[in-house]
Amino acid sequence: MVGKHCILELYGCDQYKLNDEAFVRTSLTAASKIAGAKLLNMITHRFQPQGITGLALLAESHISIHTWPESRYAAIDVFTCGNQTMPEKACNLLAREFGAKSNLLKSFIRDTPHHMEDLTRNP
């Protein structure tokens, strides 16, 4: 297994939290920690008149969020490599933090095809 990719849709969220850049950054940091991932860097951008996009770069991959406060909606991806992290825990935390009334979570195992040749060569 290369890793796990979780796609999270949050509905009925707190619109003020969805438009608070500092809150989004704090939530991404907490999600990284609870997933057992190492946060390397973070970038966020606040749109006018509303909405935020954020990316938490992890040693294990990434967490991204895109918010639409006017629709009380957020789209989140959590992708972690290896089997030492728990991306579902990050998703659960983010759903709670943003006060989602409902959510939809899809999880996928990411893996290389078993039939592919190992391209590592010895000199």
From Swiss-Prot:
UniProt-annotated site: Cleavage (non-hydrolytic), residues: 60-61
Keyword Nucleotidyltransferase: no
Record protein name field: S-adenosylmethionine decarboxylase proenzyme
Origin: domain of life: Bacteria
InterPro entries assigned to the protein according to its UniProt record, in alphabetical order: AdoMetDC_C, AdoMetDC_fam_prok, AdoMetDC_N, S-AdoMet_deCO2ase_core, S-AdoMet_deCOase_pro-enz
Family membership: Belongs to the prokaryotic AdoMetDC family. Type 1 subfamily.
Entry's EC annotation: 4.1.1.50
Record note on quaternary structure: Heterotetramer of two alpha and two beta chains arranged as a dimer of alpha/beta heterodimers.
UniProt keyword annotations, A-Z: Autocatalytic cleavage, Decarboxylase, Lyase, Polyamine biosynthesis, Pyruvate, S-adenosyl-L-methionine, Schiff base, Spermidine biosynthesis, Zymogen
Function: Catalyzes the decarboxylation of S-adenosylmethionine to S-adenosylmethioninamine (dcAdoMet), the propylamine donor required for the synthesis of the polyamines spermine and spermidine from the diamine putrescine.
Organism, as annotated: Prochlorococcus marinus (strain SARG / CCMP1375 / SS120)
Active-site residues per Swiss-Prot or TrEMBL entry: 61, 66, 81
Catalytic activity: S-adenosyl-L-methionine + H(+) = S-adenosyl 3-(methylsulfanyl)propylamine + CO2
